[in-house]
Amino acid sequence: WKVCLNVFDHMSAVATKTRAMVDAAHAANPRCEVLTTRKSMPGAKDLLTEAVMAGGAFPHRLGLSETVLVFDHHLTFFGGFEAFVEQLPDIKGRCVEKKLFVEADAERARVLARAGVDGIQVDKVPVDELEPLVRELRAIDPHVTLIAAGGVNPQNAGAYAATGVDGLATTAPFSAKPLDMSVRMRPL
């Protein structure tokens, strides 16, 4: 019973912290979703996914098979960023059933929006710089999906959502302090 209580303490805390972020995001932008990344405790993925969803958020990706998300370190295999952009039409053509997202800073995000990626995960861009960037990227491609990532937490989720992004990628709920719960045992 103690192990179950510990799991319940932790998962309830994750759901509660997630709910706080979802409420803050939706208050600022009802169309902005909170998305938790795959950087969770090993062996607890299924439980944490359930807790996140109970809190009102969604898993960013449950696995590599869901969405193609290209990070900076992947660009090496394409010959660098510029070579990746040149190959983008062919890459998108091979990802017939998948959306192609790329994590980028502000400068590269502009290039990627022009190149026609399905989505951009804008990494570590401060809120005050993100809002004008979102407007600029939407002017380039009104259909591009924009996700803010890097440092998104319950205290700033509303501010990030207010920039007009479609989603907030975060690991913050996974660091929730377990709730203080107890169990009472009674004879049958």
Predicted regions located by residue number:
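Acidic/glycine-rich phosphate/pyrophosphate-binding loops and surrounding catalytic core
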Residues: W1-E103, R110-V111, A115, G119, ...
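Short acidic, glycine/proline-enriched helix-loop-strand junctions
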Residues: A139-T145, P187-L188
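Helix N-cap/beta->alpha junction signal
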Residues: D105-A106, N153
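Glycine-rich beta-strand-to-loop/alpha-helix junction loops that act as flexible
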Residues: V122-D123, L146-V152, T171-A172
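Structured adenosyl-cofactor binding patch, chiefly the S-adenosyl-L-methionine
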Residues: L179-P187
